[in-house]
UniProtKB/Swiss-Prot annotation:
Prevents the cell division inhibition by proteins MinC and MinD at internal division sites while permitting inhibition at polar sites. This ensures cell division at the proper site by restricting the formation of a division septum at the midpoint of the long axis of the cell. GO terms for biological process: cell division; regulation of division septum assembly. The gene is minE. InterPro entries: MinE, MinE_sf. This is Cell division topological specificity factor. It comes from Stenotrophomonas maltophilia (strain K279a). Belongs to the MinE family. Keywords: Cell cycle, Cell division. SUPFAM superfamilies: Cell division protein MinE topological specificity domain.
Length: 86
């Protein structure tokens, strides 16, 4: 204990709890594997594509691929061969 220790701002328990919660949330997100928005993104892409092309529900695939330091969003759309209109 130094002479000037009383001048330092002490961390509150709320700050400590907030920091711990942020660490826990970051760990949970990294263990889950993918972001929460991928299924929603896949549904919305399917809806937009269906406005212009008649495709199946399974025709749109959305995956998150980790490539070293980068995350790559891989979107694959299987289009029909004929000129179908919805």
């Amino acid at each position: 204990m130094g002479l000037f220790d009383f001048l330092k701002a002490k961390k509150t328990t709320a700050e400590t709890a907030k920091n711990r919660l942020q660490i826990i949330i970051a760990q949970e997100r990294s263990h889950r594997g993918g972001p929460d928005y991928l299924p929603l993104l896949q549904r919305e892409l399917l809806e937009v594509i269906k406005k212009y092309v008649n495709i199946d529900v399974d025709a749109v695939k959305v995956d998150l691929v980790k490539d070293g330091q980068h995350d790559v969003l891989d979107i694959s759309v299987a289009l029909p061969e004929g000129p179908d209109k919805p």
